[in-house]
């Protein structure tokens, strides 16, 4: 979400994009291991695992990495991964949502407390920040693969809700979460390649803050994004 902020300069956006690629790979590997824990290591009988393996291949994760983690997931010592969400208030009334996938919730909670101790802000009760955001389905499409006008016409055709142009590298087609699979399928049928699809949080309103608070919020967000278990950080800073 940093691309939406006037405080996020080009250098920050590039560094974040590079870091995010690594996070995507890490998240997919964790999803793969969770799928094995839930339904076994055979993709022929585990539909969820079959989908995640295809996702990993689409992201160009090497086959040897996939195979190695499939074996690791069957180990009795390997704990299962869980999705967890944290809500924070940063500086100047800015709300922050953190999504993580972890095999140790105590470790992740400790990392979150360290983040606010080092960079400020406050962890708050569930629901305290979420009401400022809407859950949306999102299909990511490389800006190098299609022009905006063409994609916009497709967005209307497939019944999506909006086209977000604020990301540095991708157009983001937004839709109702329950329609995500259908929207992606229709886009693919029209020849559009979706590099990633997932559920995201979109701010319902943006919060203006001064330069001091803006820089403090970015420092907090950067720290949160560096936590190993964290996959996504959303905020509503203008």
UniProtKB/Swiss-Prot annotation:
It is found in: Cytoplasm. PANTHER family: TRANSCRIPTIONAL REGULATORY PROTEIN YEBC-RELATED, TRANSLATIONAL ACTIVATOR OF CYTOCHROME C OXIDASE 1. Signal peptide: none annotated. Gene3D superfamilies: 1.10.10.200, 3.30.70.980. Keywords: Cytoplasm, DNA-binding, Transcription, Transcription regulation. InterPro entries: Integrase-like_N, TACO1_YebC-like_2nd/3rd_dom, TACO1_YebC_N, Transcrip_reg_TACO1-like, Transcrip_reg_TACO1-like_dom3, YebC-like. It comes from the Bacteria. GO terms for cellular component: cytosol. This is Probable transcriptional regulatory protein CCA_00169. Belongs to the TACO1 family. GO terms for molecular function: DNA binding.
């Amino acid at each position: 979400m940093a691309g939406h902020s006037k405080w996020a300069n080009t250098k920050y956006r590039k560094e974040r994009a590079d870091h995010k690629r690594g996070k995507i790979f890490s998240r997919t590997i964790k999803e793969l291991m969770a799928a094995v824990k839930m339904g076994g290591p055979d993709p022929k009988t585990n539909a969820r695992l079959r989908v995640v393996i295809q996702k990993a291949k689409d992201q160009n994760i090497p086959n040897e990495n996939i195979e190695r983690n499939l074996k690791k997931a069957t180990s009795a010592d390997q704990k299962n991964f869980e999705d967890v969400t944290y809500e924070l208030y940063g500086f100047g009334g800015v709300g922050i949502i953190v999504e993580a996938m972890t095999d140790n919730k105590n470790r992740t909670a400790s990392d979150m407390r360290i983040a606010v101790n080092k960079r400020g802000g406050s962890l708050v009760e569930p629901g305290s920040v979420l009401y400022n955001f809407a859950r949306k389905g999102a299909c990511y499409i490389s800006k190098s693969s299609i022009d905006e006008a063409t994609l916009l016409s497709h967005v209307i055709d497939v019944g999506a809700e909006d086209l977000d142009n604020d990301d540095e590298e991708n157009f983001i087609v937004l839709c109702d979460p329950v329609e995500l699979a259908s929207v992606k399928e229709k886009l693919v049928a029209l020849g559009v390649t979706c590099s990633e699809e997932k559920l995201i949080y979109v701010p319902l309103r943006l919060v203006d803050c001064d330069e001091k608070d803006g820089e403090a919020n970015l420092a907090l967000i950067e720290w949160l994004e560096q936590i190993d278990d964290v996959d996504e950080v959303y905020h509503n800073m203008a």
